[in-house]
């Protein structure tokens, strides 16, 4: 969960700061994966909190307790609305291979982005008065 100081952060990043504006310095566990805010919101059908909930479900499903530490916490500058996937879940997604988990998540984010673009292209323009 959300913590301050020299403690490490995993999970949803709640912030009044807009997404895509990396202004939140923090440390994350080595081997973590950060899902960008726009993709989090897309997974929640435009609702970031719903996106957090959806991601948390599969992060818990793939969490692998056999994973051992990948190294020292890594300093990052994050944005509100992003989601830090813990290395234990990245490892589980990769069937026991952290690098494979990162590759799978890279592809997943890329596909989400493409799907989001297609969805936006299909939407009618805003109504005018």
Question: Each PLM stretch: what is its role?
Answer:
Residues 1-129:
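Gly/Thr/Ser/Pro-rich low-complexity intrinsically disordered regions
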